[in-house]
């Protein structure tokens, strides 16, 4: 075998395992918002929920604010996300970059 073959094989295996792990569903707990406002709602006189709904109606996507991070939500039950706008929720889904592909949505207790 050529020198370095084992190193290349190990690197490819590590990349494959990392890619597989990225597709594994995770649980996220945070506040349902929209991708435009994130954690800072800007609509004067409106609640966070009303601002979120207005922004989504204008074309923004739902988002989940977890600490200081804002994740855009793809897919999922739009009616459930609308109901939980401005509230804490438990989102199950796969994370890729800053986007969560939603598998399920539930209110946080």
Residue ranges and their predicted role:
Residues 1-10:
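Bacterial N-terminal signal peptides that target proteins for export
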Residues 17-109:
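Conserved RNA-binding domains used in RNP assembly and mRNA/RNA metabolism
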């Amino acid at each position: 075998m050529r020198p370095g073959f084992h190193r290349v094989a190990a690197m490819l295996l590590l990349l494959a395992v990392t890619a597989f792990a990225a597709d594994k569903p995770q649980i996220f707990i945070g506040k349902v918002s929209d991708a435009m406002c994130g954690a800072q709602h800007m609509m004067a006189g409106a609640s966070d929920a009303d601002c979120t709904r207005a922004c989504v109606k204008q074309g923004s996507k739902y988002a989940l604010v977890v600490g200081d991070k804002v994740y855009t939500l793809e897919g999922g039950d739009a009616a459930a996300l609308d109901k939980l706008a401005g509230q804490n929720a438990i989102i199950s889904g796969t994370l890729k970059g800053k986007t969560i592909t939603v598998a399920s949505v539930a209110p946080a207790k």
